[in-house]
């Protein structure tokens, strides 16, 4: 479509269409049935329009697969909501290793969902949780289970670990700073706030989200730590370190994958580590899978590593055995 002028400004308009058809040949006698069919056709056309936008097509005809996809999506949302309500999700914990001592310093809490015997990927159910707003309850569930794990390990004689708990932009956007539910849970579970690190993505710290500083300040004042996840994958990352009270940077796996073979990645990671040392910020390298990667990171002065080289995320009842085995090996 050609652009046109409004007030001397060129405007470009695009159209996306969804098409639905009624193919039954016989006449429709009932007015109620006419209205029912019309509503169905409109709904199908809206669904086709939505699918056309998702794939970037100018138009799409409705097909049954679109309806099946929506029904499956809605069923999964309902099942997730019930799973959160019934406390059916699990939390696994991935060890984070001190590079110099080869001992566990931290764990990252990672939520897992087994739906009718099958694991559902977090990449699938976390967006569903945000869309349905059940992410608030889910986040509180993860924090509560993390605190319970801390108390369990404490009873076994382990009281030195920090646990990272992820928080999304949506959770911050919906958060009520006048009733800090996260700190309430930590207090309720009788956990030292210094053992909890809230792990955020750069989107939480974006310039337009200045109100999030109040929440971060509350958490820091209580003694919690703040970790910035996936550092370097967004934009203007350096400004966040000046504006927000960040304790730890987590280097994204994409920087680590080829650090032992790509001199550019190695130089970039070393620069970030050196900068962090000057600022008094610790660095965690994520996605470490090879001994060669570990060697480069250790030589560069990285503080902590996380990844399958040491361990996958573990159920809570397997942590003690892992700690014993690691101590025996190192």
Protein language model regions, located:
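Catalytic core of bacterial c-di-GMP phosphodiesterases, primarily the EAL and HD-GYP domains
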Residues: 14, 21-25, 101-108, 134-212, ...
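EAL-family c-di-GMP phosphodiesterase catalytic domain
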Residues: 116, 168-175, 195-209, 222-330
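Flexible, glycine/charge-rich interdomain/linker segments that couple
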Residues: 14, 21, 31-35, 51-75, ...
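Catalytic/regulatory signature loops of cyclic-dinucleotide turnover enzymes
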Residues: 39-63, 79-90, 114, 284, ...
């Amino acid at each position: 479509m050609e652009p046109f002028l409004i007030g001397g400004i060129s405007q470009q308009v695009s159209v996306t269409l969804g098409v639905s058809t009624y193919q039954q040949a016989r006449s429709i006698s009932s007015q109620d049935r006419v209205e029912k069919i019309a509503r169905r056709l409109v709904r199908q056309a809206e669904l086709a329009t939505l699918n056309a936008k998702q794939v970037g097509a100018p138009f799409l005809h409705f097909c049954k697969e679109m309806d099946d996809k929506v029904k499956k999506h809605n069923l999964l949302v309902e099942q997730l909501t019930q799973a959160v309500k019934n406390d059916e999700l699990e939390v696994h914990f991935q060890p984070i290793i001190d590079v110099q001592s080869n001992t566990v310093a931290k764990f990252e809490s990672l939520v897992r969902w087994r739906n009718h015997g099958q694991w559902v990927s977090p990449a699938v159910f976390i967006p569903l949780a945000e869309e349905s707003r059940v992410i608030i309850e889910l986040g509180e569930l993860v924090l509560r289970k993390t605190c319970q794990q801390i108390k369990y390990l404490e009873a076994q004689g382990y009281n030195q670990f920090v646990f990272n708990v992820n928080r999304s932009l949506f959770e911050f956007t919906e958060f009520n700073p006048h009733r800090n539910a996260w700190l309430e849970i930590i207090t309720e579970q009788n956990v030292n706030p210094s053992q909890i690190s809230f792990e955020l993505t750069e989107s939480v710290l974006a310039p337009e989200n200045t109100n999030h500083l109040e929440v971060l300040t509350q958490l820091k004042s209580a003694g919690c730590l703040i970790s910035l996840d996936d550092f370097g994958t967004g934009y203007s990352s350096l400004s966040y370190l000046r504006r927000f009270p960040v304790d730890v940077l987590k280097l994204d796996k994409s920087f680590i994958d080829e650090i032992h073979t790509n001199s550019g990645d190695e130089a970039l990671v070393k620069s970030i580590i050196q900068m962090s040392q000057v600022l008094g910020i610790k660095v965690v390298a994520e996605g470490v899978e090879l001994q060669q990667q570990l060697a480069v990171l250790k030589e560069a002065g990285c503080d902590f590593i996380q990844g399958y080289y040491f361990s996958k995320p573990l159920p809570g009842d397997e942590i003690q055995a892992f700690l014993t085995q690691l101590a025996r090996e190192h």
